[in-house]
Regions:
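Rossmann-like dinucleotide-binding domain that binds NAD(P)(H)
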Residues: 1-45, 133
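C-terminal glycine/acidic-rich active-site capping loop/insertion
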Residues: 3-6, 20, 24-25, 48, ...
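Residue-level detector of conserved, well-ordered beta-strand and adjacent loop positions
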Residues: 34, 51, 159
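Short secondary-structure junction motifs
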Residues: 45, 127, 151-153
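A short, charged, Gly/Pro-tolerant segment at domain boundaries
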Residues: 134-137, 158-160
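C-terminal hydrophobic helical "lid"/dimerization subdomain
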Residues: 135-149
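C-terminal capping/lid region of NAD(P)-dependent oxidoreductase domains
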Residues: 147-160
């Protein structure tokens, strides 16, 4: 289920440019999405943090070649793109040697590469690109988020 607080802030711009979303997953895990186009001084600072019982992963779009792994029993590990300790899918999506930044266009190309493999009936991993079901779930999430906000920031159940 989701609970959303979406803000347009400007009468002449109907797009939601500031959002706070709470999520309850079917596994009893909880999540938070904070999105803002009005955060003073920020550029395109997309950050993804995932916290679990045994550790956490942190990734920042402005430093895309670094994945931070945190646990209670060890110092923070920094995993870098292009190194042999990464899995096959990660290495397949890396075109440059370690230390060379990959761009946003490369990430889009990786999605298209996976789609092309599927069309040609070549071997591919399901994580290479979103499925139709992923798209339907994404649209349901957007619709339920808007519904939650329009009904006064109430909890709304997702379809799947």
């Amino acid at each position: 289920s989701v609970l959303a607080d979406l803000n347009t802030l400007y009468d002449d711009n109907p797009m939601d440019i500031d959002a706070n979303i709470l999520i309850h997953f079917s596994t009893n895990a909880k999540g938070t999405i904070r999105s803002s186009q009005i955060a003073t001084g920020e550029e395109n600072n997309l950050r993804i943090n995932v916290y679990g019982e045994k550790g956490a992963l942190k990734w920042e779009q402005e430093n895309p070649n670094y994945l931070y792994h945190l646990t209670d029993d060890a110092p923070m590990r920094v995993l870098k793109s292009g190194h042999s300790y990464n899995d096959e899918l990660s290495l397949d999506g890396t075109k440059l040697p370690p230390g060379h930044p990959e761009g946003i266009f490369d990430s889009m190309g990786n999605i298209y590469k996976g789609v092309a493999r599927a069309i040609r009936k070549e071997s591919f991993q399901t994580a290479e690109f979103p499925s139709i079901e992923d798209g339907v779930r994404g649209m349901d999430f957007i619709e339920k988020t808007i519904e939650s906000n329009s009904k006064g920031n109430i909890w709304v159940e997702l379809n799947n």
